From Swiss-Prot:
Pathway in which this enzyme or protein is active: Cell wall biogenesis; peptidoglycan biosynthesis
Gene behind this protein: mrcA
Catalytic activity: [GlcNAc-(1->4)-Mur2Ac(oyl-L-Ala-gamma-D-Glu-L-Lys-D-Ala-D-Ala)](n)-di-trans,octa-cis-undecaprenyl diphosphate + beta-D-GlcNAc-(1->4)-Mur2Ac(oyl-L-Ala-gamma-D-Glu-L-Lys-D-Ala-D-Ala)-di-trans,octa-cis-undecaprenyl diphosphate = [GlcNAc-(1->4)-Mur2Ac(oyl-L-Ala-gamma-D-Glu-L-Lys-D-Ala-D-Ala)](n+1)-di-trans,octa-cis-undecaprenyl diphosphate + di-trans,octa-cis-undecaprenyl diphosphate + H(+); Preferential cleavage: (Ac)2-L-Lys-D-Ala-|-D-Ala. Also transpeptidation of peptidyl-alanyl moieties that are N-acyl substituents of D-alanine
Domain of life per record: Bacteria
GO cellular component, one term: plasma membrane
Protein name (record): Penicillin-binding protein 1A
EC number assigned by the record: 2.4.99.28, 3.4.16.4
Keywords: Antibiotic resistance, Carboxypeptidase, Cell inner membrane, Cell membrane, Cell shape, Cell wall biogenesis/degradation, Glycosyltransferase, Hydrolase, Membrane, Multifunctional enzyme, Peptidoglycan synthesis, Protease, Signal-anchor, Transferase, Transmembrane, Transmembrane helix
Chain segments carrying region Transglycosylase: 49-220
Transmembrane segments: 7-27
Length: 791
């Protein structure tokens, strides 16, 4: 008997040794080409880059994987315990592989199989880290062996907290969220510190099936999984029975970001994205580095700018009348027919509907959802002049655009025309708002920075400034009469015209600019010479290489809204050079400032995300460069305030502010502009078709674009006091008769004169009536260049 027992023991020992040898060989065999697990010590996960407004509102997030890295010591205990209870009960007790868990799962799964219950796994958190970082998702015996070997090795090198940190930051939680910090934000709009036990359990439940566990689609299943995690926490002693009951009884309530925490500024964000990618030299680095980018954007102004631009474009488009229905469908199965239609771009708050019935007084409409409503004829009047019956406008089956108004709808259409608006701080160059079009998602073409257009009469300002720089006084008399410019041998003479074809005769230079008189502008140009005008256009950054041609003075050059707005910003700040900038500073994922918009030490950069406005810096005095002299700058500013007080921008006077500005309309009314400024902001706005064509015979900067400026200022600038422009010491104000230009004891306008020529103006009655000029120019105007009706 003993011999038999001894023999059996020898056999068992031999089998054990053979088994150990096999295991040792397997470990040796699969350990030869394992990935380097030590790389996990250098874990820098791809993190989301976020762009903020100056007042701390989130503008945009960019990432290949939306993740915000959070160190383990910042993750609350209850959240860590939720994952340990859900995924790896013995996490702190095993060496990467839970042998007891494997045996337990094997026996439990036999019962689960027989009773058709969900099978349980025994994969530890460490094994999941190995799978997520070092191996593929291949389902094979070989991968499981490698996974177990690596898990053991990692457990010997890394602490449990280091392993848990890797897992909680790398795991995918659905809704594009990687890591617990992003999951907490995405699902509950909270930081991890603010999560309740129930919310922590919900997040811990997601890794099993993140795409399927959507409470909006399968609430019961998601709640059951969350409650399972809660009960595991109770069983493991992490929470009390009362806390578990409260957590189980709580509903799953998802929360989105509050609107006051975010700002919509798609064109602005895209400009920042492009700028920072160029700065970094790598698109991948931008999308993975977890940068915090603080911009100059003013969230409140941005909202008003978008609203004002869209309102202005819609109002202009409606004045052109109703074009036509976007489609016509059969009413036999109209709901399905509506659903089949291609998506209409730029709907925004508008909706698509089909006309079901039409009477003289209204139209009945239906929506793809099956809902019905009506459009009264009062909401169609804009579409056609003297509309007496809705039947004259719409027919059954017409697919149209509508807007909800109280308990009915109004007929609308998507504007064909487009435009842009940009707001800057003229003293710092900060771009406070930038809206590059009607709808970013319909057209990403940025009409602020990319659209080259003719500025029309906006150019006149710089013709007058060139004259002022060269000693011409603002009360100088010029003849607003016919003028003929020789274009050279064999070419017809150039005969520019005023917008309305009339003449005012002898008028002051001030009146010439206020009323935007083309012929006075040409005479000012001939008096000062094209060379000086070309120089000033380059100096102010309007165009880097303008053609030296007389039609240039009426706006035949090309520029962008950003450039021309910046040029007027220089005037607004007293003549100091500025450069538009969107980005204030950039911090890396660790909070270190890696860029700021000037070279000074930043003493206010370490601010919280809710106090970003404190990081805004002013321009250092040592960096100031004068583009024009202070006296000439104030003189042109004074003339431009006259444009608002008495001239083509008179309707803006009702704003009750001290505003300088200039309207602009290019040849054939293809481009319309208005740029207005105060000592604190400069606002540039533009309207035109993307493929240039006339906006209509009566379309001008005054009628089309100025209303956008007024609407914006009425909202965004209403609480600002009417600050005057500072008068430099080199200027003296003198009362002048506005009609004659003569000094009077109590004139109709206070004119600005330079100190060095104030004494020689009292007897200045010369009328400049030059009909030709000997200045040499290097380009001969053509028929295309003959901007004869600029306003």
């Amino acid at each position: 008997m003993y011999k038999s027992l001894f023999f059996c023991l020898k056999i068992l020992a031999l089998l054990f040794l053979i088994g150990c040898g096999i295991v040792a060989y397997i470990i040796y065999y699969y350990s030869r080409d394992l990935p380097d697990y030590r790389q996990l010590a250098r874990y820098y996960p791809p993190s989301v880059t976020r762009i903020y407004s100056r007042d701390g509102k989130l503008m945009e997030e960019y990432a290949f994987e939306r993740r915000v890295f959070i160190p383990i010591n910042s993750i609350p205990t209850s959240l860590k315990e939720s994952f340990i209870a859900a995924e790896d009960k013995n996490f702190y007790n095993h060496q990467g592989v839970d042998l007891f868990g494997i045996v337990r799962a094997a026996f439990l799964n036999i019962s689960n199989f027989l009773h058709h219950r969900r099978m349980e796994g025994a994969s530890t958190i460490t094994q999941q880290v190995v799978k997520n970082f070092l191996l593929t998702n291949e389902v094979s015996f070989q991968r499981k062996i490698k996974e177990a070997i690596l898990s053991y090795m990692i457990s010997r090198v890394f602490t449990k907290d280091q392993i848990l940190e890797l897992y909680l930051n790398q795991t995918f939680f659905g809704r594009g969220a990687y890591g617990v910090a992003t999951a907490a934000q995405n699902y509950f709009n909270k930081s991890v510190e603010e999560l309740t036990i129930a919310e922590s359990a919900f997040i811990a439940a997601l890794p099993k099936a993140p795409s399927e566990l959507n409470p909006e689609k399968n609430y019961a299943r998601v709640k059951a999984r969350r409650d399972y995690v809660i009960m595991r926490m109770l069983e493991d002693g992490y929470i009390t029975s009362d806390a578990a009951k409260e957590a189980v009884d709580s509903p799953i309530t998802l929360r989105k970001r509050d609107q006051d925490e975010t700002v919509t500024a798609d064109y602005y964000a895209e400009q920042v994205r492009d700028e920072v990618i160029k700065m970094l030299g790598s698109k991948d680095e931008f999308y993975t580095s977890g940068l915090t980018i603080i911009t100059s954007l003013d969230a409140k102004m941005q909202k008003f700018a978008e609203e004002s631009l869209r309102k202005g474009l819609r109002d202009f488009d409606r004045k052109r009348g109703f074009r036509k229905a976007i489609a016509t469908i059969s009413l036999d199965n109209w709901q399905e027919e509506l659903k089949k239609l291609p998506t209409t771009p730029s709907l925004l708050e508008y909706k698509i509907a089909v006309v079901l019935e039409v009477t003289d007084t209204q139209a009945e409409i239906g929506f793809a959802s099956g809902a019905k409503s009506k459009i009264p004829i009062s909401e169609m009047k804009w579409a056609k002049s003297e509309l007496k019956s809705a039947k004259k406008l719409l027919t059954k089956g017409d697919v149209i655009v509508v807007e909800p108004v109280k308990d009915y709808y109004a007929l609308r259409q998507i504007p064909e025309v487009n435009g842009a608006i940009m707001v800057m701080n003229p003293n710092t160059g900060q771009v406070l708002t930038s809206v590059g079009g009607y709808d970013f998602f319909a057209s990403k073409f940025d009409r602020v920075t990319q659209a080259l257009r003719q500025p029309g009469s906006l150019s006149k300002t710089f013709v007058y400034l060139a004259a002022l720089e060269n000693g011409v006084k603002p009360n100088q008399i010029f003849n607003d009469g016919p003028i003929e410019i020789s274009q050279g041998p064999g070419m017809p003479s150039w005969r520019p015209k005023n917008y309305e074809g009339k003449f005012l005769g002898p008028i002051t230079m001030r009146t010439g600019l206020e009323k935007s008189r083309n012929l006075v502008t040409v005479r000012v140009a001939t008096a000062v010479g094209l060379t000086k005008i070309v120089d000033i256009i380059k100096r102010f950054g309007i165009n880097d290489n303008p053609q030296k041609v007389y039609s240039m003075v009426l706006g035949s050059i090309e520029t962008t809204l950003e450039r021309i707005t910046n040029a007027y910003g220089i005037i607004a700040n007293g003549g100091k050079r500025i450069k538009p900038h969107f980005v204030e500073l950039i911090k890396d994922r660790n909070g270190k400032v890696i860029y700021r918009r000037d070279d000074r030490e930043c003493t206010t950069c370490n601010v919280s995300d809710n106090d970003l406005d404190n990081a805004i810096l002013e321009i250092p005095a040592e960096n100031i460069y004068m583009v024009t002299d202070a006296a000439s700058d104030y003189q042109i500013t004074s003339l431009l305030t006259g444009v608002v007080d008495r001239g083509t921008a008179y309707s803006a006077k009702k704003l009750g502010k001290v505003i300088g500005g200039k309207t602009g309309t290019s040849n054939d009314s293809k481009d319309t502009w208005f740029i207005g400024f105060t000592p604190k902001i400069v606002v540039g706005s533009y309207v035109g078709y993307d493929t240039p064509r006339t906006l209509g015979r009566r379309a001008t900067g005054s009628s089309v674009v100025l209303p956008i400026f007024i609407d914006f200022m009425s909202n965004a600038y209403k609480d600002e006091p009417p600050l005057p422009f500072k008068v430099p010491d080199s200027v003296k104000l003198q009362a002048v008769d506005r009609a004659t230009g003569q000094i009077t004891p109590s004139g109709s306008v206070m004119e600005a004169f330079k100190i060095n020529n104030i004494l020689i103006i009292e007897d200045d009655s010369e009328i400049i009536d030059n009909n030709h000029n000997n200045d040499v120019f290097d380009y001969v105007p053509t028929e295309k260049d003959q901007s004869q009706e600029i306003y």
